[in-house]
Amino acid sequence: MNPIVINGTVLCDNITGIPRYVYENVVRLDKLIEGTGLDVRIAYRDDGRPIHLPELKNIRLVPLKSIPYFYNLAVLPAYLRRTHAFYVGLASDMLLTRRSVVVLHDIRPLVLDTDKGFFRFKFWVHCLSTKWFAQRVFTVSDNQRHLISEKLGIPERVIEAAQQHLSAEDKRLDAVLGQLD
């Protein structure tokens, strides 16, 4: 089976907000996949900052040398192609691969007039990459699901409002893992 690669670069940041979401899901996923034989990896931009994770038993860390911005545009996509990996973006990540799912937490920077300049442009490009490449999009609420569909033109059938965690009782995990075979 091809590897599943999660972008873990946000785990080098302070663990609040979206990095906390990624951290909690990775720690839970490490326990959930025990004994399944799945090859799950956390790829992250190795720029000298430590990655904030406990010791993982079933998920492998893959540091990739890169400069900022070049990581998501070239280094990570090249690694995904080289390893024939399925990509999981848990942090509203920019992606340049079709074999992927992404969590787009919200699109507030595109809807509200509070964010300006480069950040807003960068976020818009990230959202467009989601529209063009992601097979499935997950978000935090039904309201965000409708907003993402309306503002980005992504069909609602590929967007799912999902709980903010995985649990052993969550049967959707079995469905997702079944699609990877």
What role is predicted for each listed range?
Residues M1-D181:
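Carbohydrate transferase catalytic cores enriched for Leloir-type hexosyltransferases
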